[in-house]
Amino acid sequence: MEFLSKIVRVHIPDYLNSVPVPDSFGGFLDLTAGQWLHLFAFSGTVAAAVYVSVKPYLDKKDQKDQLVNLRIQKESSKVVNMVDIEDLGNKVCYCRCWRSKKFPLCDGSHAKHNEDTGDNVGPLVLKRKDV
């Protein structure tokens, strides 16, 4: 714990005091090449830390704004498909990627969707239990 305390109380303040931040804009003209390098290294580190901290929140916003259903029953406020369980037969595959031309049944469109997006979605397969 003493090691961490020394870093926070001694080394970080010493480093921040050594960063060559001029008092005015004209002071930037007086900086040497070594001071510019030190200033760029510090600025780059701060920018990278801010980017790494903010990036996950920006990605979530982009994901939230993307539509899942691009074309199926867009005139409806909610897409609902009812299927009588007695009509299923032995095996049926339902689409979960919303790309099927035979929606709600799967036509294998998820394979192209997965290839294009890197997703791993597949169909919902309902199968009668073998007795």
UniProtKB/Swiss-Prot annotation:
Entry keyword set: 2Fe-2S, Endoplasmic reticulum, Iron, Iron-sulfur, Membrane, Metal-binding, Transmembrane, Transmembrane helix
Note accompanying the cofactor annotation: Binds 1 [2Fe-2S] cluster.
Topological domains, Lumenal: 1-35
Predominant place of localization: endoplasmic reticulum
Superkingdom as given in the UniProt entry: Eukaryota
Chain positions recorded as [2Fe-2S] cluster binding sites: 95, 97, 106, 110
Protein name, as recorded: CDGSH iron-sulfur domain-containing protein 2 homolog B
Phylogenetic classification of the source organism: Eukaryota, Metazoa, Chordata, Cephalochordata, Leptocardii
